[in-house]
Amino acid sequence: MATPLQPFLTKTHKQNPIIGFNILTFVVTLFVALFLVVFLVAPYQFEIKHSNLCKTAQDSQLCLSYVSEIVTTESDGVTVLKKFLVKYVHQMNNAIPVVRKIKNQINDIRQQGALTDCLELLDQSVDLVSDSIAAIDKRSRSEHANAQSWLSGVLTNHVTCLDELTSFSLSTKNGTVLDELITRAKVALAMLASVTTPNDEVLRQGLGKMPYWVSSRDRKLMESSGKDIIANRVVAQDGTGDYQTLAEAVAAAPDKNKTRYVIYVKMGIYKENVVVTKKKMNLMIVGDGMNATIITGSLNVVDGSTFPSNTLAAVGQGFILQDICIQNTAGPEKDQAVALRVGADMSVINRCRIDAYQDTLYAHSQRQFYRDSYVTGTVDFIFGNAAVVFQKCQIVARKPNKRQKNMVTAQGRTDPNQATGTSIQFCDIIASPDLEPVMNEYKTYLGRPWKKHSRTVVMQSYLDGHIDPSGWFEWRGDFALKTLYYGEFMNNGPGAGTSKRVKWPGYHVITDPNEAMPFTVAELIQGGSWLNSTSVAYVEGLVE
């Protein structure tokens, strides 16, 4: 049988054995050289070609190993990222039945609840990654920002799930799966950060009255009171509306609505827990005023867990809440008890009151904007890992339990490539009437780092005298003090002095406006592209 080398070894005339041996040696040497080129040089060239994709990864070698699973030699960065995300979707879909099986094997109701939360978060994450693939394909700056926001939310979802399971000692059952998903989410963010985007769009669009993702009709709605709005459905306890509970009205709202759907809730106290699921898009809930329409609940961590303890939760994109009070009345003795949890992208909370004690407002994930609202609490009462801006709000520390300290914020950013952070701008950070006379007995701080890359900036705001001179407090020892970013810029009031502030590597007294700009509506939440349509008042930059 002929061999591949036969043409080099066969002679039609008289064969010289020395020449034949030399030819054989040459061919073997050539074959070995080609082998080395293909199997040694080619991977090196791949690594050189695609190493930029992993340049912002915390573990670049691990990132490259993931990239090598799906890369082809002709793939550009965007194509590689898309293939990686497609595989990521499959992995999450495979994880869902694993978590569901474990849930069905557990009898403890609280543990089942934690696993139910994980299933919900995984389901949301599948959609967010799928949407990111479509956004990346458009190759524009605004869509790149969308993808970064959504993938940041995916990582937050996975970390939230792991936190929930860890609190019930369930992480060992799911830890391997979750650790893998968390790692891949971080790699996806690193790859996205390395993919260049066109410069043909400008995300900062000057001053306006809302981020760009708020339509002109939404603007008009947000300039109106509830009774003046032509609502799709009305909620009234006395039977004069379409429904007597908000939960019924939300459940009846159309799924995946592309236009604004308004539910008007008349004056009254509604004792219920409400969830605006991911399918309830572009939903607006409006009441008769923050002191007139009250939604109240009392779920808490003592009786369950933090994530589902909210009185109202919103996940559906484009959510608007206006002229309503959301409260959790569990009290300080019940520890974490959330009034409002928001994971809805491009959401607006306007002229609302949010009342509780510990963990009042869970700004969980995605882009959020709060305006002219009143938020009260004690420990970590604004927490989560959203990209969130508060403007013209009153942020009010209450009297905590004995031996407790007030923490205004506890930001939960876990990766430097996440486009998340808490920005408090043009706000009043003040003491409640019950705290004010005893504020020397209960210290109040601007925040503490919940996660390793915690990021919070307080700027152009009034800080009352209850703020401790050190300003910020550690979470545990020196955890995150080098990796966090905490900043203060142009604040005023008796608590605004920075001479006695903490000396952490990650703390910054900002003097350059350019350093403050990333925490504005324009840049942190790309507000110029979506708030315009809501009609809520806002400032996009640093100048009112």
From Swiss-Prot:
SUPFAM superfamilies: Pectin lyase-like, Plant invertase/pectin methylesterase inhibitor. The active site is at residues 359, 380. It is found in: Secreted, Cell wall. Its EC number is 3.1.1.11. Pathway: Glycan metabolism; pectin degradation; 2-dehydro-3-deoxy-D-gluconate from pectin: step 1/5. Glycans are attached at residues 174, 257, 291, 532. GO terms for biological process: cell wall modification; fruit ripening; pectin catabolic process. GO terms for cellular component: extracellular region. Its main location: secreted. It comes from the Eukaryota. The PMEI region may act as an autoinhibitory domain and prevent untimely PME activity during transport. This is Pectinesterase 3. It comes from Solanum lycopersicum.
